[in-house]
């Protein structure tokens, strides 16, 4: 009898929830909201994200349009999938959408938004961005690390030359190069060869790609605890803070003459030279931004560029011809040579178009109600810009939008530095990535040296997945399988 009563109560609860859900759905249809696919009770549209959300959301946008409203649990999410719609959000109404939503994972790792990429829109964010734009990633600062880039590229070339008769794990070589450059620039020394550092970075990258159920359905937050996410967050945040604190303290105890980001930020903290105070937590958060924003995404672009070139040997041949013609009898490619390499820049653009390192840009959040293309967007709406979908939009790129064809950029005005929303791998507007020049110059000079020094081919025993463009899961999307190649 008791069991029967419990079953009846459970059924009544389910019926009541379903009735309330459909009533709310009906009310929502009367408001002037963007088109939205049908939602399930409680989780709403969460089940439609799939293994690769950028692909799933792109497919949904073909049916519901470039401005599409989803609900992840209790959170309204506006998905933007076209260049015109992105212009409305990132340019026309840039200020309204300039903030960032809170996230359990990001808050725990990035010191509750003390960094630049994830800080809420406001005075603190403006101050930290000015430090990055005017100092850390200024053209002068980027040029000052030219020798670091050249030294690490020379070491990479020598390593490849020694292994020239063997199958080379190009993915591993590229990630090691990127790690070494960024560690030297940001921290003043290499850490990439240390197993504990590599493990820390792998755990960080993996965790940033996790999905926190509790961030969207608060009453299901216990699921994050059950599956170990909360424990992993505590562990990784403590390990990262311990590592960064040790690095900063080593600089404090040193002679103060290192030319790296930590030393520069400590000088600002000590001398108060920028008109506002910067503390130890802010320093650690900004350095963490450099690792997350540059390390994984930079090597990912290089990996995809070499993948596409090996898949399209006519493009590889053309790039190689250009690089060798510009450099002629030089032993290597210098950064001064890059300005004359138009096809190289086209290859970088085309790779960014088809394989933006962050297919779904870091989410934005509306701070006020706003009218967007006759749709009402309330304050507190999360906004996801699908850079992957925008880069493959046939209306912009033509019927061959899915094909790798660098030639399309040779006479094109479209650029990736924020002026044109047809190509937004680094974002646009107020929240555009401040480190574009820092990342792109490394990508260009590495790729140019790779094709200048060696003739590349796939191993004879290469299986189909070597040239497959299957993607990994996570925040930054790289190849599912490592890229192996040989030099001839």
Swiss-Prot record:
Where heme binds, per the record, is at: 433
Q: Where in the cell is it found?
A: Membrane
Q: Which UniProt keywords apply?
A: Heme, Iron, Membrane, Metal-binding, Monooxygenase, Oxidoreductase, Transmembrane, Transmembrane helix
Query: What Pfam families does the record point to?
Result: p450
Q: Which superkingdom is the protein from?
A: Eukaryota
Q: What class of enzyme is it?
A: oxidoreductase
The cofactor named in the record is: heme
Give the signal sequence positions. Answer: none
Q: Which GO terms describe its cellular component?
A: membrane
Family, similarity comment: Belongs to the cytochrome P450 family.
Q: What is this protein called?
A: Cytochrome P450 71A24
Q: Which organism is it from?
A: Arabidopsis thaliana
Gene name in the database record: CYP71A24
